């Protein structure tokens, strides 16, 4: 199921090869989880002993450890590692065929690697550990995104090792930088590769008439070539202009700056990067640019395992959820769009209604008659749910079949769809823009926990939903002409006509 976890699938398939028959495949996959969990405990033991050694052994101590120091260091490692090993959370993930054992192993591995770097930070080739950490993070993205939570700890270890005057203020700065790195990886690199591949795919399939996924393959080769060019230029210490130019080109082709749904954000960030590289910062250390280039490149290598999802879906296997056999469906697959979104930091509550917009009046029969005998009707305003349109969505076209006219498409877009259909061969059609309902913001809040209107009855079994008048906030609309507050009308309720007074009353 989305998002696929291809590295987990490949590793589990490797262990399944050792099953004597099909009935034992699940046993071998569970054995994989057990083995990876055991390695996690080993890495945790090494991590604890390293940190305790730093606390108990002074830098200027010479000779071997004393017996007391040895027992403290080894005892701490054994107690800490086994306490985690036998905890319910870890133990039950270690004995099931799920991704969490693998994810724990990747997490333990990257933190142990930063400690290995910390031991050798002054050596000329210590950067290889940082690049290896980036590669493991790239691989672990194809297992579970939890591994990204190691980045703040890694940045703190790096900062305290490189800078001797660290304090609370600088530690907070380091944490903020780590959050920026997480955002660039999670919201930049991970979807950025797919966004760039989509543009290449449209160019080669719709523009040049190539077969499906040709553009994605071309993008992979182009990106690899540009990364190699940038790395070689930095390694050979070429001219500053060439090094900065290839560095900028590699950042662009990675798509990491195209954060969010708007392309303007990416172009603005690229312009800012170009200004910083070529006009503001003239003496960027080659070593820093080289580590950044290598890190992005190896993350790209690890992330390329998602090609398995495309290949597997193209084979049309019996279990083929969402059929992500092209980069457009793959993006929806990786973004977990089928699960919807949960407001974690800020968003709607159970009582946040959707906004509605006026679309015209209809006539309601009051049951009375006019003087001429015709029905006496009153106008009733009609509203529709207000929707916010997002990015254009594409779908694979059916060869030789004219695409159905999609709601929300412009006439020019419909004509372009028909033109591609008449051309024949493989092509992608525009199927409309993704729409999201616009909610009334008055009842939004920070950290909403009860937000789904579909689960109102379930919430009542868990907590008390007090809806008495004392606990409700009265809301008013503002008359745009007079500026006075007026009661809001219930656009769901039907107005009532009073024949005695001849008035129409709308429910508030």
Language-model features: where?
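Short hydrophobic/aromatic helix or loop-helix immediately within or flanking a transmembrane segment
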Residues: 1-23, 34-35, 42
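Aromatic- and kink-enriched transmembrane "portal" helix at the membrane-lumen/periplasm boundary
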Residues: 22-30, 34, 55-70, 77-104, ...
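Transmembrane-helix motifs of polytopic, lipid-linked glycan transferases
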Residues: 31-65, 109-113
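Specific aromatic-rich, kink-prone transmembrane helix
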Residues: 43-47, 90, 102-122, 129-137, ...
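Membrane-interface transmembrane helices that cradle and orient dolichyl/undecaprenyl
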Residues: 52, 57, 65-71, 110-129, ...
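Short hydrophobic alpha-helices at membrane interfaces in multi-pass membrane enzymes
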Residues: 71-78, 113, 120-138, 167-180, ...
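Transmembrane-embedded, aromatic-rich helix segments that form part
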Residues: 106, 146-159, 191-194, 264-271
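Membrane-interfacial entry segments at the cytosolic side of transmembrane helices
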Residues: 164-176, 208-217, 236-247, 262-266, ...
């Amino acid at each position: 199921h989305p998002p696929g976890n291809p590295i987990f699938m490949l590793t589990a398939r490797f262990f399944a090869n050792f099953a004597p028959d099909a009935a034992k495949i699940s046993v071998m996959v569970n054995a994989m989880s057990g083995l990876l969990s055991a390695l996690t405990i080993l890495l945790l033991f090494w991590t604890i002993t390293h940190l305790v050694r730093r606390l108990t052994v002074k830098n200027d101590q010479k000779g071997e450890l004393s017996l007391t120091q040895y027992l403290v260091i080894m005892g701490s490692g054994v107690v800490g590692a086994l306490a985690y090993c036998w905890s319910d959370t870890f133990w039950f993930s270690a004995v099931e065929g799920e991704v969490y054992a693998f994810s724990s192993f990747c997490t333990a591995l990257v933190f142990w690697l930063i400690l290995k770097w910390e031991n050798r930070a002054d050596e000329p080739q210590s950067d290889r550990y940082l690049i290896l950490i980036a590669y493991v993070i790239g691989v672990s993205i194809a297992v579970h995104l939890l591994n990204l939570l190691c980045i703040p700890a890694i940045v703190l270890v790096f900062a305290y090792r490189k800078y001797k005057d660290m304090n609370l203020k600088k530690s907070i700065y380091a944490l903020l930088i780590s959050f920026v790195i997480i955002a660039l990886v999670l919201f930049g690199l991970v979807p950025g590769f797919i966004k760039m591949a989509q543009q290449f795919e449209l160019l080669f399939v719709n523009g040049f008439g190539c077969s499906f996924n040709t553009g994605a393959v071309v993008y992979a080769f182009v990106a690899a070539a540009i990364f190699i060019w940038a790395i070689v230029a930095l390694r050979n210490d070429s001219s500053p202009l060439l090094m900065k130019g290839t560095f900028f080109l590699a950042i662009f082709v990675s798509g990491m700056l195209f954060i969010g749904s708007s392309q303007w954000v990416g172009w603005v960030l690229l312009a800012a990067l170009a200004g910083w590289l070529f006009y503001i910062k003239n003496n960027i250390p080659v070593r820093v640019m080289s580590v950044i280039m290598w890190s992005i490149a190896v993350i790209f290598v690890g992330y390329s395992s998602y090609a398995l999802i495309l290949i597997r879906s193209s084979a049309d296997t019996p279990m083929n959820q969402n059929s992500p056999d092209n980069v457009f469906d793959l993006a929806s697959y990786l973004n977990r769009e089928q699960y919807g979104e949960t407001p974690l930091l800020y968003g709607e509550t159970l009582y946040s209604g959707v906004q509605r917009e006026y679309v015209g009046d209809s006539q309601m029969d009051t049951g009375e008659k006019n003087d001429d005998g015709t029905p006496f009707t009153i106008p009733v305003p009609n509203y529709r749910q207000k929707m916010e349109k997002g990015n254009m969505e594409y779908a694979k076209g059916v060869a030789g079949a004219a695409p159905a006219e999609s709601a929300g498409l412009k006439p020019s877009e419909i004509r372009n769809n028909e033109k591609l259909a008449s051309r024949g061969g493989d092509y992608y059609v525009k199927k409309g823009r993704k729409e999201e309902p616009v909610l009334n913001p008055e009842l939004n809040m920070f950290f909403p926990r009860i937000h789904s209107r579909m689960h109102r009855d379930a919430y009542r079994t868990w907590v008390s939903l007090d809806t008495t008048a004392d606990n409700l906030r009265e809301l008013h609309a503002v008359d745009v002409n007079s500026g006075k507050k007026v009661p809001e009308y219930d656009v769901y309720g039907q107005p009532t006509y009073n024949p005695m007074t001849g008035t129409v009353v709308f429910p508030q």
